[in-house]
Amino acid sequence: AGRMAEPKFSRKKLVLRSSAGGSQLGTEYAAAHSNHVSPETVLALGADAVLMMAVLGGADYRSLQAVGEDIDAFHQLSIPVIVEILSADFSKTNSFDVQYHGARIAAEMGADVVKAFYVDGFDKVTSCCPVPVILAGGPKDRDILDVARQALAEGARGFAFGRNIFQAKDPAATVAGLASLLG
């Protein structure tokens, strides 16, 4: 376990990614991602929430069993959980079926927030989900501000972006644009 080293970070919000399984660079993309962070470590680091992945379309029983057990463990220590929806066949992650069913399943398993990729019919994804849905970054071939604006119009409650910001031509302007969309 560790702690935040810099006092200037003490008032920032920290969401700690708690699961991993594989990457698109490897020879195998895991059908189930395993949790690698304990609730006690999350608290020791001062994190405000965790983000884990739910992988559908592969070893669903094993994947969802682990997600459910992990959500329960974090909730026992009052740690909010964000669940990101992925497909075992990564090329299908941005499909309506994966995002729609994944959002509903994650909420039913106890997720406090669902991180979903924008798909045609995104309003159905947000309306089927009884917890807030935040937008995942997704493909870099579209203007992220346009996608974010559309997602908000269709029920998204916020964003969880990484590469869409730090690989942007002007990351500060991208963050400012996203913040302006949220009011």
Features from the language model and the residues they span:
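Alpha/beta enzyme core
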Residues: A1-Q24, E28-L135, K140-F161, A172-V175, ...
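A short, acidic, flexible beta-alpha connecting loop/helix-capping segment that sits on the rim
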Residues: R163-K169
